[in-house]
Structures are given as structure tokens and as C-alpha cells.
């Protein structure tokens, strides 16, 4: 009996060791996918979301485009609260850059209001949607498939407005994004940005318990990496207010206005806990 007990213990130990090694191998395989750059993982993830009917990948309708031409319109930087019209002002003849703003949702509205629109997005599907709406409505759009974590492919001081909806949660270094937005804006140009605060990244998937230590960075923490992979969430990063608003100030912007918003669904939304910030900032003449 003693021999059998030892044999069972030994076999059990071997099996546990084997399963552990297999699990570690699978994690390594997933990490190796990410090592082709987190930006490319996010590109593939968002392309897949668009194909699955993602809310922020559905192009605006013809009726909404016509309504905008008649002065009735709304666009979003965050999930539920429309951008105040006075934040944008008269758009006739204005040059707008939609930064990580593809999908055919905001740029068609701005075109209908008379703006000269350029959009940069790393998602192929979001860029396809821009061309789809432009062809349907008969206007030209400069739509560029590009990565905002790199130097933007534009000269200095050429845009009047940079419209940047929630998206820098997919970027590890947000300071670079704000610096580039400042560079491509004209003097007195405006940056409109939708921003995550840290709250979405401290809670579990049910939004009931605080489980994550900040900052949330899957490139530096195995547990958060596995969480992102399991949730089909791409690679996301938390950014605090120092990074999000302080980063704009550090880039040279002057903060003009601000509002908050919720997720639009889920327990945090039901509790009216604000998880997003929208900012209006200016590149004032010095």
C-alpha cells in the first residue's frame, strides 16, 4: 500500500507538472503573437470587432448625413454624451483631422457641415468604412491607414481641429499623441479629445470588484495580459489624469472646457460612475 501511495503521488506530480508546462507554453504562444507589436494586435482586434458589428464601426446613415446638411447633427468623443456644437463652431472651410477616428461616423458629418476632412486610423476596416460613406454620398475624403504611435504623416500647423475620440487607451505612450496633435495644429487650433480615466481598469469584467493595481499595462504584467487575451480586448492601457490632461498641458495646450461621461452600459453606468472625460484644448498663439 505504501508503494502504491508513493507511485500515485509521483504520477500526480508528473501530471500536474505537465499541465503547468502546457499552460505556460500556451501563454508564451499568445505573448509571441503580441510581440509582433501591440499596435498590430489592436489593429487586428478592431478589424475583427468591425466585422462582428461593433457599435463604433457602423458607418453613419444616409439620413443622418442629410440631416447634418440641414443643421441637425451630433457626434461623440465618448460613449453617450454628444459633443456640444459650440465646441466645434462653424466648420465651413475648416481643415479637420480625425485622429484614430475612422469608421465613417464623424467625418461624414463634418463634411456635410462644410469641413475639409482627413482621417487617420490603423484599422483597415475603419478606413474602408470612410471610403464607403464618401462614395455613397459623393464627396472626397483623405483617409490614411496609419499608426498614431508613430510620427504623423503631416506637415506642421496644417489643421484647424484635431478630433480624437476615445482611442488612446490602445496606446502605451499618450504623451507622444498629444505632442503630435499639437505639432499638426495651426496656431489657435483646437484639440477635442475623448479620454478614459482609470476606473474601467481597476474593476473585474462584471464591474463589481476592484482587482487591478494601477497602472494597467499588459506589456509589463502577465496577469493583465492573460486577462486582455481571454476577453478578446486587444491590448489596452490605463492612463491617469496626470497623463491625460497633464499630458495635453505639457504638450503646450491650454484647457478650455471639459465634461464627463459613463460607459453607456454595465454596472458602473448603472451607478452613474463617470469613466470618460472629454476635453477641449487650444494651441494658443504665443
Q: Model regions: which residues?
A:
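Short alpha-helix
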Residues: 235-258
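Conserved alpha-helix/loop element of class I SAM-dependent methyltransferases that forms part
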Residues: 60-94
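A short glycine-rich, Lys/Arg-flanked "PGG" loop and its adjoining helix->strand segment in the class I
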Residues: 175-190
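Class I SAM-dependent methyltransferase SAM/SAH-binding core
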Residues: 94-151
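Conserved class I S-adenosyl-L-methionine
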Residues: 190-223
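A short SAM/SAH-binding and catalytic strip from SAM-dependent methyltransferases
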Residues: 160-175
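A short acidic, Gly/Pro-enriched loop at the edge of an enzyme's catalytic core
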Residues: 149-162
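Core SAM-dependent methyltransferase catalytic element
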Residues: 251-253, 267-286
Amino acid at each position: 500500500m505504501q508503494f502504491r501511495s508513493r507511485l500515485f503521488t509521483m504520477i500526480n506530480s508528473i501530471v500536474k507538472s505537465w499541465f503547468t508546462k502546457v499552460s505556460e507554453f500556451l501563454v508564451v504562444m499568445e505573448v509571441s503573437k503580441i510581440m509582433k507589436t501591440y499596435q498590430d494586435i489592436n489593429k487586428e482586434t478592431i478589424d475583427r470587432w468591425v466585422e462582428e458589428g461593433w457599435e463604433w464601426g457602423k458607418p453613419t446613415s444616409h439620413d443622418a448625413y442629410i440631416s447634418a446638411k440641414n443643421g441637425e447633427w451630433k457626434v461623440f468623443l465618448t460613449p453617450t454624451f454628444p459633443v456640444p456644437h459650440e465646441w466645434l463652431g462653424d466648420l465651413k472651410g475648416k481643415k479637420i483631422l480625425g485622429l484614430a477616428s475612422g469608421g465613417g461616423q464623424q467625418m461624414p458629418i463634418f463634411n456635410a457641415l462644410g469641413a475639409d476632412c482627413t482621417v487617420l486610423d490603423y484599422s483597415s476596416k475603419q478606413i474602408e468604412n470612410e471610403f464607403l460613406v464618401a462614395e455613397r454620398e459623393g464627396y472626397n475624403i483623405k483617409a490614411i491607414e496609419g499608426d498614431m504611435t508613430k510620427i504623423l504623416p503631416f506637415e506642421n500647423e496644417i489643421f484647424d481641429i484635431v478630433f480624437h475620440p476615445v482611442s488612446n487607451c490602445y496606446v502605451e505612450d499618450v504623451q507622444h499623441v498629444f505632442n503630435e496633435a499639437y505639432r499638426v495644429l495651426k496656431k489657435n487650433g483646437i484639440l477635442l479629445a475623448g479620454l478614459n480615466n482609470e476606473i474601467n481598469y481597476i474593476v473585474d469584467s462584471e464591474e463589481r470588484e476592484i482587482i487591478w493595481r494601477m497602472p494597467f499595462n499588459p506589456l509589463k504584467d502577465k496577469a493583465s495580459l492573460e486577462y486582455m487575451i481571454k476577453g478578446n480586448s486587444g491590448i489596452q492601457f490605463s492612463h491617469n489624469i496626470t497623463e491625460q490632461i497633464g499630458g495635453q498641458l505639457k504638450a503646450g495646450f491650454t484647457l478650455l472646457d471639459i465634461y464627463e461621461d459613463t460607459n453607456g452600459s454595465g454596472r458602473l453606468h448603472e451607478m452613474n460612475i463617470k469613466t470618460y472625460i472629454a476635453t477641449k484644448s487650444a494651441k494658443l498663439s504665443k
